[in-house]
Amino acid sequence: MNEVIVMAMQQRDKLIEEIRRIKGWGMSLTLSFAKSAKFFGGYVMDVEAVGKDILDCAYAIHSRFGSGLLEKAYRVILATELKRLGHLVEEEKVCGFSYNGQEYQNMFRVDLLVDDSIVVELKSVSRREPVFAKQCLTYLRLLDKHLGFVINFGMPSLKDGIERIANNI
């Protein structure tokens, strides 16, 4: 078993060096191992880089389609674009939590969970509501995640519809 772990770590290190060499990123590239990941050889870039990909895709989608589609359409398109970039994307992930030793299953759905690290809540309504950010922060806390976004595609200007939510665990 230990030999398998050592081999996996050696392969990880080789992959990191190869990516740095190809991209010219040097030591500034931050990679972390993600056990459950089935993408990019088991590696995922740091959450800020993933967050940038999410926002870049959201802006491209909003530029192309505007604010007239249903939330489901934006979710499917955004998930498809992020997968195309090599991210692990779980759509409408059913989640639960524990409280006082009791497990509560199937209590809420996260619109998108990207690379098992970023919660994305999507909306397609004409105004921003404070409850959207509260909902996202609650999901971050229950899932023990650090970063989330509320993206409201219903706003005429997408920059007015994006909220970055940080959970200071």
Task: Say what each PLM segment does.
Residues G26-L88, L137, R164-I169:
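Solvent-exposed, charged helical/coil patches
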Residues D46-L55, Y59, Y99-V114:
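Accessory recognition modules or surfaces
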Residues G66, V89, V110-R128, Y139:
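Conserved catalytic cores of phosphodiester-cleaving nucleases, focusing on short active-site segments
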Residues G68-L70, E103, P156:
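Gly/Ser/Thr-rich beta-alpha loop segments that engage phosphate groups in nucleotides
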Residues K83-N100:
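A short acidic/basic microdomain associated with nuclease active sites
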